[in-house]
A protein has these predicted regions:
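Non-ligating segments of multi-cofactor redox enzymes
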Residues: 1-202
């Protein structure tokens, strides 16, 4: 089964995935219409800064077993047997945050949601864009990612590709393959900026 796979070494922190995610979860599924919606749609993928300010797109891994599901006291969090996606029923969520405390990745957020009763704050996380994939589209975050940091693929195929990259790297005794030149240059500049900042502070 396909899923969104994260390649953090390719992330440039542009946050287009966050914008696309919010728009995809708007009632009208349109960025421009989303601005006028109440409650305003929020992204379910979040880009944070890692080492050397490297971007990291953090999203739900739909763990199996899922710690959030096991911690949910009301049974609001469940796994869809057809898609293997961990979902949240907003009608049953009581905003207790037990799921957030159990999640090892910190991906749950709490805010008003279009699918929830008006004015109710509920737990929200990635739903693998199930509505989009049911129509034959790929998840919004992977669709807009131009660097390959987020790809929609079979896990086995993605792992085989990683193995090939490692094998090529070892056999050629060079740096990792598959990072676009512009991304590699961007990462080099980020590292130089961090080093320069440290030198100035001394």
């Amino acid at each position: 089964m396909k899923q969104v796979i994260v390649n953090p070494e390719k992330c440039v922190g542009c946050m287009q995935c966050m914008l696309a995610c919010a728009a995809a979860h708007a009632k009208a599924e349109s960025l421009f219409a989303a601005v006028e919606e109440t409650p305003r749609p929020q992204p379910r993928v979040h880009v944070g800064a890692g080492l050397f300010n490297q971007g990291f797109p953090n999203r739900c891994r739909h763990c199996d077993p899922a710690p959030c599901q096991l911690a949910c006291l009301t049974g609001a969090i469940f796994r869809d047997a057809a898609t293997n996606t961990v979902l949240i029923n907003p009608d049953r969520c009581i905003n207790c945050a037990s799921c957030a405390m159990a999640c090892p990745y910190g991906v749950l957020r709490f805010h008003e949601e279009a699918a929830a009763p008006p004015g109710k704050t509920v737990a929200v996380k990635c739903d693998n864009c199930d509505a989009r994939t049911a129509r034959g589209n790929i998840p919004a975050c992977a669709e807009v990612c131009k660097t390959g940091a987020l790809v929609y693929d079979e896990m086995a195929h993605a792992m085989n590709e990683k193995t090939r990259q490692v094998a090529r790297t070892i056999s050629s005794d060079t740096t990792a393959q598959g990072v676009p030149d512009t991304v590699a240059l961007y990462n080099t500049l980020k590292q130089a900026t961090v080093k320069a900042g440290k030198a100035i502070r001394r």
